[in-house]
Amino acid sequence: MASAEEIQRLFDDIQHLYGKGPDILISNAGYGKRIRDIADISIDEFDYTLNVNLRPSFILSKLSLPHMITYGWGRIIFVSSLAAHGGGINGCHYAASKAGLHGLMKSLATKHAKDGITVNDVAPAMIGETGLIPDEKVLEGTAGDVRNIPVGRLGTPKEVANVVMMFCQTGYLTGQSVLLSGGLK
């Protein structure tokens, strides 16, 4: 969904079907190859990672905000990553893309709080049941090894959804990132 044209068509369809833009935007794009050494990350891989993880959230926010401002209410929630805060098992290209998302969240939250719009992010790490971690054995010996997670298990998509719902329901919480990592740093 990195194409601005595709995203614009999506918004046109929403406008046509519902007669208005979205009140709540949840941007949950995620891509990242586990390439630990910067020397092994090609410029194309770096660009692709930012184009998937950061660019669509910018475009979606840009298209959502006018409607939210008009109605004086809105929620924008980005699904970021522990990597945005310097942790995780992916490379610096992934961390940079998610840190960019965190910066976008902070900037939009400050600018649009007065408009009745909250902007936050949930920063999960080591979430199972998504297909991204096919087997806990893959993680053995890495920073994401389940034995390194203080709660002793992977997180679940439902736990991520619970944080997203909290952000949707809470108008006094903006500019915040909830690290959902089982205590992993």
For the regions a language model picked out, list residue spans one by one.
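Substrate-binding pocket helix/loop in short-chain dehydrogenase/reductase
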Residues: 36-38, 45-47, 133, 145
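Active-site helix of classical SDR
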Residues: 61, 97, 105
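Alpha-helical segment proximal to the catalytic Tyr-Lys
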Residues: 66, 110-114
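C-terminal substrate-recognition "lid" of short-chain dehydrogenase/reductases
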Residues: 73, 153-180
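Residue(s) in the substrate-gating loop at a strand-loop-helix junction
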Residues: 81
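Short, small/polar-rich loop/turn modules that mediate ligand/substrate recognition or access, typified
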Residues: 113, 118, 173-176
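A glycine/serine/threonine-rich, flexible loop-to-helix segment
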Residues: 114, 124-148
